[in-house]
Regions:
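Terminal helix/beta-alpha structural elements that buttress the NAD(P)+-binding lobe
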Residues: 1-241
Length: 241
């Protein structure tokens, strides 16, 4: 199995450097691996490397019912972290809660900044994880405590517009980072350690991998349409046979 790597995954065969490959445990299927390697290693570096979460912490995590989000829900629960997640439908809210998310905010029906402030008694949270980008960026900053950390790790709604660094000062001496998985698994040792942590949680029953949508390789256009319409939940995979 592998995560990331060179562009060109929409193919029957790939050429991947041997040092980027990982041996799957016998108990984990190829379909599970396809649905968890990129997503699970992303959660590992977000929660265990970039900013090590501790039991009792409270966080905001956008897109809590997506492929990364559902793993994050379960990982946060295993760590004893209170996770406040945002979703775009009642169905997705139920799914996130069922996977361990402590509180869910439906951004279609609620102002997520106001609701988070209510849930935290006006304090905000020390860390926000935002893979949505343009649509949520300003609100995410408003959810942070003074000296809080904004982790912008995706831009599903579009790139974040340019902004002045002085805004970070005026909002409470905030920190911001734009990480990628590649920089947290650049060394073979880092990749193996992250994979072992992920595999261990799956085999221990702490993580259940949701392969929610499966498409034949010739259905890739429909797969993109479904994701762009935000009607998917969990992970989507392409099947080559």
């Amino acid at each position: 199995a592998y995560a990331g790597g060179p562009v060109g995954a929409y193919a029957d065969y790939r050429l991947v450097p041997a040092e980027r490959l990982l041996k799957l445990p016998d108990q984990i299927s190829f379909s599970q691996a396809a649905a968890m390697m990129l997503q699970g290693l992303t959660v590992h570096y977000l929660f265990e490397k970039l900013h090590r979460l501790q039991s009792g912490d409270t966080i905001l995590f956008h897109a809590a019912a997506g492929g990364v989000g559902l793993i994050a829900c379960q990982w946060a629960k295993a760590l004893g972290v209170t996770m406040i997640g945002t979703v775009g439908s009642a169905e997705k809210a139920e799914l996130a809660l069922a996977n361990g998310c402590s509180h869910v905010i439906n951004y279609k029906t609620e102002n997520f900044v106001h609701r988070l402030r209510e849930l935290t008694q006006g304090q905000g949270v020390p860390v926000v994880y935002d893979s949505v980008g343009k649509d949520t960026f300003e609100g995410s900053l408003d959810c942070l405590q003074p000296r809080g950390l904004m982790v912008s790790f995706g831009n599903a709604s579009g790139a974040v517009p340019p902004f002045s660094l002085s805004e970070l000062a005026s909002r409470g001496s905030l920190f911001i980072t734009r990480p990628t998985l590649a920089h947290y698994t650049a060394q073979r040792e880092e990749l193996v350690a992250g994979a072992n942590s992920l595999f261990g949680k799956v085999l221990a029953g702490q993580l259940h991998i949701h392969v929610k949508q499966q498409y034949a390789l010739n259905q890739v256009i429909q797969a993109h349409r479904d994701m762009e319409a935000r009607i998917t939940t969990g992970s989507s995979i392409l099947l080559t046979e």
